[in-house]
């Protein structure tokens, strides 16, 4: 939940990765990133910096509940002095519930997550060795708490998942 990456191990022992660089560089597809996106989208809307096409009301309520804050400024302690990445990522569980209840902003964050997770896999495809595909040994294993909410991003994941026969030249 606090990070996201994809790893490839080829038959010759070579490894390749995509993502997993941490929250400062990019953890797209992780619970932390979804929490960050929810806060960013909500705050940008409330600042009138980048108005959201979806209501941010429910997400703001969830942020207030999760971080036990009443004003927007109070989030700063959780982003800096008291930063706790697993706690921050814990907001994602509340976002999942709101998405299941129909909140459009939360649903959009999960759709975006499906795209990111598919892109992790797509990024590694050029590195897949022919032997791995020929033997039928190419398995994609999905682990982590974000996958417990696969129903919320399955459509966007599969839409963006590579439709390929893996003809590698």
What are these regions (language model features)?
Residues 1-57:
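Phosphate-binding/catalytic loop of phosphoryl-transfer enzymes
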Residues 40-169:
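ATP-binding/phosphotransfer module of carbohydrate and carboxylate kinases, centering on a glycine-rich
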